[in-house]
Amino acid sequence: MKKLAEFYRGKAKTVYHTSHPSFLILEFRNDISILDGQCIKQFDRKGMINNKFNFFIMNKLAELGIPTQIEQLLSDNETLVKKLDMIPVECVIRNRAAGSLVRRLGIEEGQILNPPLLELFFKNDSMHDPIINASYCTTFNLVSDTNLVRMQQLTKHANNILTKIFDKKGIILVDFKLEFGLFNNQIILGDEFSPDVSRLWDKKTLKKMDKDRLRQNLGGVIEAYEEVAIRIGVSLT
């Protein structure tokens, strides 16, 4: 399948058309952004790590009943995917308090959330992805009620799968974001799962092993990404 012109350039990935109208190529760049793209830095190997990390996780989810857009790993930093009609609603699930939740509610970072908290955000960088609820989705026709329920079900299912995968390797899955789209009128998991869109802490030390290392000037960003990948079994060779 031939790679064609650029379709979309995001903060850390570039999407390309292909010679088949139903498929795209995701290119994972070495860019890493914070503050809704206002600050972008580059780290060697980052695109490769996230591409292979994402491919590994998406396949694990697909094996356990979650439909994903993943088709084929093409190279160190490229993956062939289904072309989805993306839904502008992000599903965030939180197993522990961190990030914006701590700031909004004034609760202690690391507080265990039982049951896990599922939040919805309107995907819009210029408005800093405001938090919304199901009523917003209906009123503004962001996603149908049926599809929203399906997205929430799949997010909870993914959380059940992923918390076990990471826990077995000594990692706490603190929270993560998922994005969905439509393919042949079916809800499909799209975008990516990587340390860019999740929070991951070491179980023993609570060391942060995700993009918070950049947000909080902790250093060792790529080293942390690589350690998580290797622990859970991602082949980086």
UniProtKB/Swiss-Prot annotation:
Catalytic activity of the protein: 5-amino-1-(5-phospho-D-ribosyl)imidazole-4-carboxylate + L-aspartate + ATP = (2S)-2-[5-amino-1-(5-phospho-beta-D-ribosyl)imidazole-4-carboxamido]succinate + ADP + phosphate + 2 H(+)
One of the protein's GO biological processes: cobalamin biosynthetic process
Tree of life domain: Bacteria
Pathway: Purine metabolism; IMP biosynthesis via de novo pathway; 5-amino-1-(5-phospho-D-ribosyl)imidazole-4-carboxamide from 5-amino-1-(5-phospho-D-ribosyl)imidazole-4-carboxylate: step 1/2
SUPFAM superfamilies reported for this sequence: SAICAR synthase-like (SSF56104)
One GO CC annotation: cytosol
Alphabetically ordered keywords of this record: ATP-binding, Ligase, Nucleotide-binding, Purine biosynthesis
GO MF, one example: ATP binding
Top-level enzyme category: ligase
CDD domains assigned to the protein according to its UniProt record, in alphabetical order: SAICAR_synt_PurC (cd01415)
UniProt keyword annotation of DNA-binding present: no
Enzyme Commission identifier(s): 6.3.2.6
Hydrolase recorded as keyword: no
PANTHER family membership: MULTIFUNCTIONAL PROTEIN ADE2, SI:DKEY-6E2.2
Family indicated by similarity: Belongs to the SAICAR synthetase family.
Name of the protein: Phosphoribosylaminoimidazole-succinocarboxamide synthase
